């Protein structure tokens, strides 16, 4: 039977991608349905109990700047917060938080259940309703049909998921959850390229059986950072320490002696695993010269005895897992309460997607998260927000939106996926962004919140907070520009005491702040330049904008040159066989990728500058040279 109500957008899957997608579509005013196999696992952290990190924290800040959920949920659930790369430049500084699994899930579910325009329904989806190459709904396991104008697939590792522990394996979406077999089979019938990937998780350890006195504690930062631009440290629950131990030669010997029982090394697992989060058996074999590997023992929550040993993801048999754990200092008597495992699952080639994450072949069908070949909660959540936004726009017959590479790490993410695809689980790093000085954590709201407001994602509270912050920054910078001191000023000795060389000519506050020996706090402590801003976010922004102004200006000039290519559009249905002068290799690659712009085409491996020139000349001759606004 058909459900009586029609929806604008259906989201299939309630993980990090699905929850952000559902919230985004609903915030835009679209009637949204979130279909999940289990309401109790909405927003579940399936692997490590942490949010953020290098590149990943940048994505979380961008999600927050666009009105998303992840940063706010982390502030309510975070039990340890740290700024990584704190001693380095602002472009690569990143926030990371340990999170209480239960509190995180509760924060996500509470937000979903209180979001207007959003309905949640518990049923596993087994089929899509596709008519004339357009998706129009979904069918659940009991035959209930839901109709919608757009559908977003955020099914994680559930598509034909297979769990491996040693040489044994069984079907599963993750430990304790069933796989999605019927939906996987249905999607394989569509004109989409599909492949297999693999990821893994470590065994969980009972904290009561660990001798923490032998371990090095790792504490969070003080003052405690926050993730959301609207957050404050008072929202955080009780803070906890992590601890550090190490593998050793005994650990490595256990692993080497049992490689024949590893499903990876026995050839049972076909999917490729994440390069930057390898299993412990992979680390031991790939880095044979290393005598030890650092392992972080991370608490799973305030009310749990479970410890997540970050660094020993494994699919070796349980008896070998026990030997590995007990070979390490402080864990000699440790008990495992959940075995580690590897999971293989279907993913769909993201080159078959537009930068909006809509399928090039099935109208109204959007993909987000691990189904696109990514790994990580943050990458999934960012894609989910974008897919939910664009599904909402599609349902309202509006053009899709996606950020450019110079506007957001989210732009880098979707451009990499839709242009280059991936053969291994893709994770974000700051090194993937060529304009990372512009794409800092601290300015994510300045880059994206105004756009989010225009798109209908940003509510009045966030907009008022943002507008006040922008005004504060502008006024403070103008104030510093207006205050001048000269070598004979009354208070010049106070300033000279901070400088390597005495002031030799007149200077204003911004010029003094550009000097490496002076920061904003020091400058505003001087009689002439006080008082300082009380909002630390605004104060940091003033300092960064002033100190890095020259570098930022140069990078902006580079971006403007590149934008000419980015804004030159390519027809979606163009057959590149028509373009005389292109080599067969270039024609094949362009027809395979179907790039949406000259800029995107130029980033495809093997597409030369000469080929781009030929293409531009041909477009002009044919009267097809169009540029986006």
From Swiss-Prot:
It is found in: Cytoplasm. The keyword Manganese does not apply. One of its GO terms (molecular function) is flavin adenine dinucleotide binding. Pfam families: GIDA, GIDA_C_1st, SAM_GIDA_C. Its cofactor is FAD. Transmembrane segments: none annotated. Its main location: cytoplasm. Coiled coil: none annotated. NAD(+) binds at residues 273-287. One of its GO terms (biological process) is tRNA wobble uridine modification. FAD binds at residues 13-18, 125, 180, 370. Keywords: Cytoplasm, FAD, Flavoprotein, NAD, tRNA processing. Homodimer. Heterotetramer of two MnmE and two MnmG subunits. PANTHER family: GLUCOSE INHIBITED DIVISION PROTEIN A, PROTEIN MTO1 HOMOLOG, MITOCHONDRIAL. This is tRNA uridine 5-carboxymethylaminomethyl modification enzyme MnmG.
